[in-house]
């Protein structure tokens, strides 16, 4: 991941922040795809790190593993990005607090972004944008229950009127 993800400094970041919480370029990279195509049909790599402008190591900060998977998926125009975690996907509410919460098996990118940004911890909000821009689906799956359907996030999900999910963040009110 470090050799493939190039950190981008933001103008307002101090030197310390340029190493500890970076963003990366994620526009499709045919040269990178060609370089990696000679290997296995599936890319499995560590997440969370990138290469800084001076060649050193930079980290992607909170949610960096999800985000690096999304960056690589977008760069490579992958068929999908899989996020394996401790729950089977995104739910209509926090299943640890609401026993009747429903697994949301299909969401569009905007719905997933809203749910992730307002408190769902299963997926970091930053990882959705690169996949949405590249039209790469995100699959969320459960490491303990791989047979479960999980959640698919893509541009083909039907958006229906009404409430899909309820989420919360302490100290924040969104109206």
What is each residue range found by the language model?
Residues 1-128:
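Nucleotide/pyrophosphate-binding catalytic subdomain
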Residues 1-6, 91, 140-157:
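Terminal amphipathic helices with adjacent charged low-complexity linkers/tails
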Residues 42-43, 58, 138, 151, ...:
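A broad, low-specificity signal marking well-ordered, structured residues that form hydrophobic/aromatic
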Residues 64-67, 142-145, 160:
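Short, charged low-complexity intrinsically disordered segments located at boundaries
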Residues 123-126, 137-146, 166:
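Flexible, glycine/charged-enriched surface loops at secondary-structure junctions
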Residues 131:
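Acidic-aromatic/histidine active-site loop/patch
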Residues 149-175:
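A conserved regulatory-domain signal marking ACT and ACT-like small-molecule sensing domains
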């Amino acid at each position: 991941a470090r050799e493939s993800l190039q950190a981008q400094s933001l103008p307002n970041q101090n030197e310390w922040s340029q190493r500890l919480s970076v963003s990366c370029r994620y526009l499709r990279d045919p040269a990178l795809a060609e370089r990696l195509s000679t290997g296995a049909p599936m890319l499995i790599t560590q997440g969370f790190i990138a290469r800084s402008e001076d060649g050193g190591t930079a980290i992607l900060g909170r949610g960096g593993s999800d985000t690096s998977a999304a960056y690589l998926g977008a760069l490579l125009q992958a068929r999908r990005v899989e996020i394996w975690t401790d729950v089977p996907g995104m739910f209509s509410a926090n299943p640890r607090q609401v026993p009747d919460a429903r697994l949301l098996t299909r969401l569009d990118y905007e719905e997933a972004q809203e749910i992730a940004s307002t408190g769902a911890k299963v997926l970091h909000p930053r990882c959705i944008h690169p996949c949405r821009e590249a039209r790469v689906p995100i699959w969320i799956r459960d490491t303990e229950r791989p047979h479960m359907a999980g959640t698919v996030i893509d541009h083909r999900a039907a958006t229906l009127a009404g409430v899909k999910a309820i989420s919360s963040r302490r100290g924040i009110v969104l109206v």
